[in-house]
């Protein structure tokens, strides 16, 4: 080990935590940056657990910045990570009983909050909204198809449970979330 030329301490706080301390709030999700996003989500939904709003607010930021940097939803690599982030946010929206496309609308609120700091976010706003809306529509179609296949399997087997093999097929072949199959 060698001494640093300028000794310092890294608290590992991150920008959101520093903002929370500076704004006198106890949670990163109570800072001004998240407040408007969370309020926008609440305006589109029924009352629900705070964790749903926080996940959606966090995931719209991640999704928008990934798309801004050239990533699009895909079945592999970075695109797969983006797809999973978007779909996880959508599932939290469904838990809040939001039934129509909503996630892409949050890009507008995000660009109001962060567009000055990140001008590229403003420049690509319409593109980001389009990509997210397309993924929302694709996921809605996936869910509809999965529910149809699931119902057909229940009708065919006349059982209360489906096989693990069929559940995996729904997930692997059709992209139907395993947790929704379990429900």
Label each PLM-derived region with a short phrase.
Residues 1-183:
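A glycine- and charged-residue-rich anion-binding loop/surface
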